[in-house]
Amino acid sequence: MRYVASYLLAALGGNSSPSAKDIKKILDSVGIEADDDRLNKVISELNGKNIEDVIAQGVGKLASVPAGGAVAVSAAPGSAAPAAGSAPAAAEEKKDEKKEESEESDDDMGFGLFD
C-alpha cells in the first residue's frame, strides 16, 4: 500500500510516470525502506495508465464487494427455549458488558473510531 500511495503522490504532484527512484525518495523522506521487488511490481502495473481511470476502476470493484453486516443465523431446533436459570446470569453479563464498554469509551475521548 505504501508503494501505491507514494506512486499516487508523485503522480498527483505532476510526475506522470514516476520511477523507482522517485518513489524511493518519497518513502525515504518518511523513514520507510523500499522493497525493490514490490516497488517494481507496482511501477510495472501502474506505468502508462491514467491514475484517475485506475481509481475509478478500483471504486467500481470495491462497490461490488459486500461490506459485512447482515448474516442470517438460524438457531438449532432444540436451542429455541433456554433454561430458566440462565436468564438472570445473562442479564448480569449484559450489565458487566455495558460497564466495560463505558470505560472503554472514555479512552478514545468520545470519538469512537472503531464503533
UniProtKB/Swiss-Prot annotation:
Which residues are annotated as modified residue N6-acetyllysine in the UniProt record? Answer: 21
Give the N6-succinyllysine positions (modified residues): 21
* Renumbered residue ranges of the record's region Disordered: 76-115
UniProt keyword annotation of Chaperone present = no
On the tree of life, the source organism's domain of life is Eukaryota
One function term, GO molecular function aspect: structural constituent of ribosome
Chain positions found as Phosphoserine: 17, 19, 79, 86, 102, 105
Short name of one Pfam family: Ribosomal_60s
GO biological process, any: translation at postsynapse
**Which residues fall in a compositionally biased region of kind Low complexity?**
76-90
According to the UniProt entry, which residue ranges have a biased composition of type Basic and acidic residues? 91-101
- Keywords of this entry: Acetylation, Phosphoprotein, Ribonucleoprotein, Ribosomal protein
Q: Which positions carry N-acetylmethionine?
A: 1
What GO CC terms are in its UniProt record?
Answer: cytoplasm; cytosol; cytosolic large ribosomal subunit; postsynapse; presynapse; ribosome; synapse
Say what the protein does: Plays an important role in the elongation step of protein synthesis.
User: What family name appears in the similarity comment?
Assistant: Belongs to the eukaryotic ribosomal protein P1/P2 family.
What is known about its subunit structure? Heterodimer with RPLP1 at the lateral ribosomal stalk of the large ribosomal subunit.
- PANTHER family attached to this UniProt entry: 60S ACIDIC RIBOSOMAL PROTEIN FAMILY MEMBER (PTHR21141), LARGE RIBOSOMAL SUBUNIT PROTEIN P2 (PTHR21141:SF5)
The protein's name in its UniProt record = Large ribosomal subunit protein P2
Q: What is the species listed in this Swiss-Prot or TrEMBL entry?
A: Mus musculus
